[in-house]
């Protein structure tokens, strides 16, 4: 299954706020799930919607998400928590959380077009897994700086998560540590996502 490129507002009306996908929001929170449903939602439907929420927020293909779930399942600790850590430490998501891009798809374009450096070297892989003490910056070129500055100017002034530090004047961010569960930028029940895939096998 390919990465979603359809109407974004349609997705947030069905699944709720997806800040990584789009900065747009419905006029009121009550409209998020106000669409009529045919009867009570099944447990399968609930797990499916939670999985879709995770996939669309982080901009993943189905195959990519399955791979992350498998990696998380082999790691020590809670599979759901490890899964969120893996997704949150992706380079495209780090750029988004720093405010250097207004959305994760926008961050992915910055990386693909070679505007982003990690520890002084160009990295053009959006899924690159960032580590503590990594320094994320833009190329020392006017176009790269303008793209990031436009995003920082338009970004909502949300508090920066504790695992990141931003020096906006230098177009530079630092990964301080691995993110903890409190710093995740999406309201999600990750256990339902793990349950969804465990029942598919």
From Swiss-Prot:
GO terms for cellular component: chloroplast; small ribosomal subunit. Coiled coil: none annotated. One of its GO terms (biological process) is translation. The keyword Transmembrane helix does not apply. Its main location: plastid. GO terms for molecular function: rRNA binding; structural constituent of ribosome. Keywords: Chloroplast, Plastid, Ribonucleoprotein, Ribosomal protein, RNA-binding, rRNA-binding. InterPro entries: Ribosomal_uS4, Ribosomal_uS4_bac-type, Ribosomal_uS4_CS, Ribosomal_uS4_N, S4_RNA-bd, S4_RNA-bd_sf. Residues 1-43 are annotated as: Disordered. Residues 89-150 form the S4 RNA-binding domain. Residues 1-14 have a biased composition (Basic residues). It is found in: Plastid, Chloroplast. One of the primary rRNA binding proteins, it binds directly to 16S rRNA where it nucleates assembly of the body of the 30S subunit. With S5 and S12 plays an important role in translational accuracy. Belongs to the universal ribosomal protein uS4 family. Part of the 30S ribosomal subunit. Contacts protein S5. The interaction surface between S4 and S5 is involved in control of translational fidelity. This is Small ribosomal subunit protein uS4c.
């Amino acid at each position: 299954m390919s990465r979603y490129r359809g109407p974004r507002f349609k997705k947030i009306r069905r699944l709720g706020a997806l800040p990584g996908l789009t900065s747009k929001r419905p006029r009121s929170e009550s409209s998020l799930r106000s669409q009529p449903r045919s009867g009570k939602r099944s447990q399968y439907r609930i797990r499916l919607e939670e999985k879709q929420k995770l996939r669309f927020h982080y901009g993943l293909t189905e195959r990519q998400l399955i791979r992350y779930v498998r990696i998380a399942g082999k790691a020590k600790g809670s599979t759901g928590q490890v899964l969120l850590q893996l997704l949150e430490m992706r380079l495209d998501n780090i750029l988004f959380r720093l405010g250097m891009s207004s959305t994760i798809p926008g961050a992915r374009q910055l990386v693909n077009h070679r505007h982003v450096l990690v520890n002084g070297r160009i990295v053009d892989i959006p899924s690159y897994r960032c580590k503590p003490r990594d320094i994320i910056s833009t190329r020392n070129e006017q176009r790269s700086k303008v793209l990031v500055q436009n995003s920082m100017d338009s970004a909502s002034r949300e508090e920066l998560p504790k695992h990141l530090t931003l020096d906006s004047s230098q177009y530079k961010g630092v990964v301080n540590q691995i993110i903890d569960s409190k710093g995740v930028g999406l309201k999600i029940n990750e256990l339902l996502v793990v349950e969804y895939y465990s029942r598919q096998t």
